[in-house]
Amino acid sequence: MKQEILEVFDNTYPDRDYTIEIVNPEFTSVCPKTGLPDFGTITVSYIPDKTCIELKSLKYYFLEFRNAGIFYENVTNRILDDLVAVSSPRSMTVRTEWKARGGITETVTVSHNASA
């Protein structure tokens, strides 16, 4: 997962609070215990400050996880950390919803608030 893949562009409306929601319904990674693929939906919601996340670079960033052995919780926190590092949003929430494995689903949500 190469953070340097991520790109941003200038926010044309930095004086206005507005929410951007990005959904990736086809996210994949690998279970570090079993080596089997994990499938999930990643939702990123954020209020930008000076920059916005460029979507093509985000797509390629997400593809970096495809062969990575990483737990759900770590995926979610890593994505938040990397996106906050490159875009410095006013606030951001990353929610990952994972398909059933053994009849159990999991959802992980993590947030960042710049004013906190």
Swiss-Prot record:
<dbReference type="Pfam" id="PF14489">
    <property type="entry name" value="QueF"/>
</dbReference>
<feature type="binding site">
    <location>
        <begin position="53"/>
        <end position="55"/>
    </location>
    <ligand>
        <name>substrate</name>
    </ligand>
</feature>
<dbReference type="GO" id="GO:0008616">
    <property type="term" value="P:queuosine biosynthetic process"/>
</dbReference>
<dbReference type="GO" id="GO:0033739">
    <property type="term" value="F:preQ1 synthase activity"/>
</dbReference>
<keyword id="KW-0963">Cytoplasm</keyword>
<keyword id="KW-0521">NADP</keyword>
<keyword id="KW-0671">Queuosine biosynthesis</keyword>
<comment type="function">
    <text>Catalyzes the NADPH-dependent reduction of 7-cyano-7-deazaguanine (preQ0) to 7-aminomethyl-7-deazaguanine (preQ1).</text>
</comment>
<dbReference type="InterPro" id="IPR029500">
    <property type="entry name" value="QueF"/>
</dbReference>
<comment type="similarity">
    <text>Belongs to the GTP cyclohydrolase I family. QueF type 1 subfamily.</text>
</comment>
<dbReference type="GO" id="GO:0005737">
    <property type="term" value="C:cytoplasm"/>
</dbReference>
<dbReference type="InterPro" id="IPR043133">
    <property type="entry name" value="GTP-CH-I_C/QueF"/>
</dbReference>
<keyword id="KW-0560">Oxidoreductase</keyword>
<dbReference type="InterPro" id="IPR050084">
    <property type="entry name" value="NADPH_dep_7-cyano-7-deazaG_red"/>
</dbReference>
<dbReference type="GO" id="GO:0006400">
    <property type="term" value="P:tRNA modification"/>
</dbReference>
<feature type="binding site">
    <location>
        <begin position="72"/>
        <end position="73"/>
    </location>
    <ligand>
        <name>substrate</name>
    </ligand>
</feature>
<protein>
    <recommendedName>
        <fullName>NADPH-dependent 7-cyano-7-deazaguanine reductase</fullName>
        <ecNumber>1.7.1.13</ecNumber>
    </recommendedName>
</protein>
<feature type="active site" description="Proton donor">
    <location>
        <position position="38"/>
    </location>
</feature>
<comment type="pathway">
    <text>tRNA modification; tRNA-queuosine biosynthesis.</text>
</comment>
<feature type="active site" description="Thioimide intermediate">
    <location>
        <position position="31"/>
    </location>
</feature>
<dbReference type="InterPro" id="IPR016856">
    <property type="entry name" value="QueF_type1"/>
</dbReference>
